[in-house]
Amino acid sequence: MSAADTTATPSALPGVQFGTIARHGDTRGAFRELWRARSFPDATFVQANLSTSVAGVVRGLHLHRRQDDLWVVGEGRAFVALVDVRPALAGTGVAVVETRELDADDWVYIPTGVAHGFLAVEPLQLIYLVTNEYDGSDELGFAWDDPVVGVPWPTLAVTPDGRPITSDRDAANPSLSDLLVRIRHAPD
């Protein structure tokens, strides 16, 4: 992405970047440049994925110790929650939460050690590039609604009971404190 193709905004979390891609459209449709290597010189993306979600889905909170992510919203709207657990992992502080609402053409770069999840506010297509191929041993997660973490998720009006739609895996995730204990006691 060149300076003409994207705009970036700062984050409170070290290494996290937010931005918006330029959409070039005419009567035929639209074109968007999703990624350019020189815009992320320290990241070597090796796999691209496409996730689709119906409104009301929460995915996360997921954590990788060996993978950076670049998310691009293809279509729809997402409430994105990022939780920097690097200070907690190092034993030097507590997790820090940052949230943003991202629309089509918005992107976020998520470095290793920053947990991430989203709520599909409306039907959502999320494209994500990652710096490592899928590795199940690096698929960590903690409860999206962990009260100690306190992500300020928006109220849901898209499901009858106001609860999000989650996967069985995400619904079974432990608390962040339990995950940190497991990580600290696991061999590298």
Annotated model-derived regions:
Residues 101-122:
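Conserved metal-binding segment of the jelly-roll/cupin
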